[in-house]
Swiss-Prot record:
Entry-linked InterPro entries: Antimicrobial_frog_1
Keyword flag Secreted: yes
Family classification: Belongs to the frog skin active peptide (FSAP) family. Brevinin subfamily.
Disulfide bonds: C18-C24
Function: Antibacterial activity against Gram-positive bacterium S.aureus and Gram-negative bacterium E.coli. Has activity against C.albicans.
Native organism taxonomy: Eukaryota, Metazoa, Chordata, Craniata, Vertebrata
Domain of life: Eukaryota
Pfam families in alphabetical order: Antimicrobial_1
Descriptive protein name: Brevinin-1Pe
Gene Ontology cellular component annotations, sorted alphabetically: extracellular region
């Protein structure tokens, strides 16, 4: 497991969750 993947996921996941939950 790479720290780079973790950092990218930390940036991408909130945007995906925001789009799904419509809580921006």
């Amino acid at each position: 497991f790479l720290p780079i993947i973790a950092s990218v996921a930390a940036k991408v996941f909130p945007k995906i969750f925001c789009a799904i939950s419509k809580k921006c």
